[in-house]
Amino acid sequence: DEFVKVPGTTFKNTNGDAAVDHYQRVEEDIRLMAEMGLKTYRFSIAWARIFPTSMDEVNQKGLDFYHKLIDLCLENGIEPMVTIYHWDLPQFLQEKYRGWESREVITDFKKYAVTLFEAYGSKVKYWITINEQNIFTRMGWLTAQHPPKMSGEEKLYYQVNHNVFLAHAEAVLAFQDLVPDGMIGASFALHPSYAIDCKPENVVAKMDYDDLKNYWWMDIYAHGRYPKAAMKYLQ
């Protein structure tokens, strides 16, 4: 919310104060979804709406809104699918320790995730930890298109990604204990690649591309380790 108020960061200098006004129109929105025959609604919970000023104080009104949203989905035959983090880090954490740049965020993210699991785990079966980690980290620390608006910080970019991986893992482990009958994973913006021909050097180039642009994230989500090419690059 703070970032989009900076002139020049968004198209036509729009901001998120009202956006699509889902908070006020939630009943109408879910009714329209039901009329359209939608069977699943994937939505994101705003971390800053649950913990707006401190990780020591939960905003009950925020929890209540998502209870209402989830209940409306279920009443209308729509399966809720919750995304825990969709790029809305609370501003106070950015100011306190620079957010994802610090390992302190791992503990705070786990606390936030556990709060959601305890609140909604009996109603929601399908969960997503992080939305498109490879996008928000690249645009935040390499191309300055997203907060914290940094460019060319390659070493920091990889450290941030490592912190996000650890936060994801902590959330998954907590989820398995608290919502044993649920399903959880990460959302990833895959960048498909194809070798230009069957020459061995081009096939290997395609494999290296996948290791550096896709499996760097996917292997960690699935296997808990970096691909060999990624590790060699980091070293």
Question: For the regions a protein language model found, what residue spans apply to each?
Answer:
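Active-site region of glycoside hydrolase catalytic domains
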Residues: 1-10, 53-55, 64-235
